[in-house]
């Protein structure tokens, strides 16, 4: 899984969703 700067910006919301589930 590669990580991009754009993903890092959405990492906060993405992490919340992944952590929530």
UniProtKB/Swiss-Prot annotation:
Tissue distribution: Expressed by the salivary gland.
Keyword Secreted: yes
Disulfide feature: none
Gene Ontology terms, MF aspect: toxin activity
Top-level taxonomic group: Eukaryota
Any single GO CC term annotated in Swiss-Prot or TrEMBL for this entry: extracellular region
Cell compartment(s), UniProt: Secreted
Post-translational modification comment from the UniProt entry: Contains 8 disulfide bonds.
Main localization, broad class: secreted
Role description: Helicopsin exhibits robust neurotoxic activity as shown by immediate death (about 8 minutes) of mice due to respiratory paralysis.
Family statement: Belongs to the CRISP family.
Note: Negative results: has no hemorrhagic activity.
Identification of the protein by name: Helicopsin
Organism this protein belongs to: Helicops angulatus (South American water snake)
């Amino acid at each position: 899984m590669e990580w991009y700067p754009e993903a890092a910006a959405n990492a906060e919301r993405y992490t919340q969703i992944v952590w929530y589930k």
